[in-house]
Amino acid sequence: FETETADLVILDAPPQDDGTWKNLAENELLAAAAQRAGLDTESTVTALPVGQSLYAYWADNRVLTELLQSDAALDDLRAATWEEWFDFVTAVTHWCAEPGAVQVTLNGNAYTLPAERRETLANLNGVFAAQGPEVSGNSGDGGVAENTPALYTTALLAAGEPLTEENLTGPLNALEQELRLEDANSAWQAGIADLWTSKYLFQQGNALFYRGYLADLISDSGAALSSAQKDALVWLPIKNNLTEADIANQRFNLAGLMNYPILANRAWLAIPADADEESARAAAAAVLWLYTSKAGESALIDTLDLITPWGTGSNQNAAAAMQAAQVTAGILPGAALDKTQAAALQQAQRGLYYEADGITLRDGLWDEDAAAAWRSAVMAALGAESAEADDN
């Protein structure tokens, strides 16, 4: 995504109503566009969504099938318990270092890793390629890592509303365990991977799983996947170490939060409050072109591989068609965070990877003090209510 077109700015999360951005609901045509996107135009609308993309772990099904020596493994891997997932990831890391026939259990069914490294698995040297809390070259607002809001979705859905420290503690602990698992089993051991590095690791076959948006992965920006790789993409849910006791939200159960991909907004469009009349008119015209014309819709679904804010998708390639079908089959709704919250979450997450000076990378996994500081910072970023506040 480019930073801006005229005075139309592309952001990774909607900004707060602080006077910096135009209220799009004040323009009759933009208000209609906002309503088409499902936004409340009785309130201030600082940005309109560009579109949504599935957020998950992504695998090349040819590699996955070769590794687990079965065409039936995908469904069992999706339905695996946390314990099975943890053991599988650990086993694959050991296998990468020293290939050998090792049995793993997924959804109660046994699979055996191959006794030797075959051609399809020649470059595999780790399990995960995942963007850390850093900004890549395509971050439109230059400040928030692309995956930050989506990463916290499962924890927020488990905690429910109103958001309290008590309800959020268990889900955050569950997310931390998944982040620890990723870090300990990463295909990248030279610091924190950004979006481009993660995508390159997956494209080269170094990593079994890529965590991120499908739209980013199949984009030709950066390390472009081959047509065969794109056609072979399959999703895996991001499995936080949740238990039933961690779920305060009665709308979701453990299987629902553990076994489905997330559908999250990929970017937002906003117009600066100080844009002159001509620039603001041009920016509004660009938004309306996307929202109301066939060519604009095609740009969203066929070029950017997004699901439109009004729910349409593309079937022009296998990956986009799979995404559109999955929206109907079942997804988790992405977290609704504003830009300030997303930036604060990113900063909180950096504390897991950097020492207190914010510059020096930690040598190995973070300690409990860093984890406690992260949880506190996340609570503050999200405005979680404390028990003391509830008592007053």
Regions found by a protein language model. Give the residues of each.
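Short helices/loops that flank or line small-molecule/ion binding pockets
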Residues: F1-V9, F86-H94, D183, D194-Y210, ...
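Extracytoplasmic/periplasmic solute-binding protein
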Residues: A37-V50, Y55-Y57, E83-T164, A207
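Glycine-centered hinge/linker elements that transmit conformational signals in sensory
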Residues: F86-T90, G137-T197, L201, D231-K239, ...
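C-terminal capping/gating helix-and-loop segments adjacent to ligand/active sites or protein-protein/ligand interfaces
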Residues: A325-N392
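A ligand-binding cleft/hinge motif common to bilobed small-molecule-binding domains
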Residues: P14-D18, R211-Q229, N241-E244
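Extracytoplasmic/periplasmic substrate-recognition and gating elements
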Residues: L225-G313
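Short glycine- and hydrophobic/aromatic-rich loop-to-beta-strand nucleating segment
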Residues: Y55-A59, L269-A270
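Hinge/lid segment of periplasmic solute-binding proteins
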Residues: F1-A56, T65, L236, T243-G256
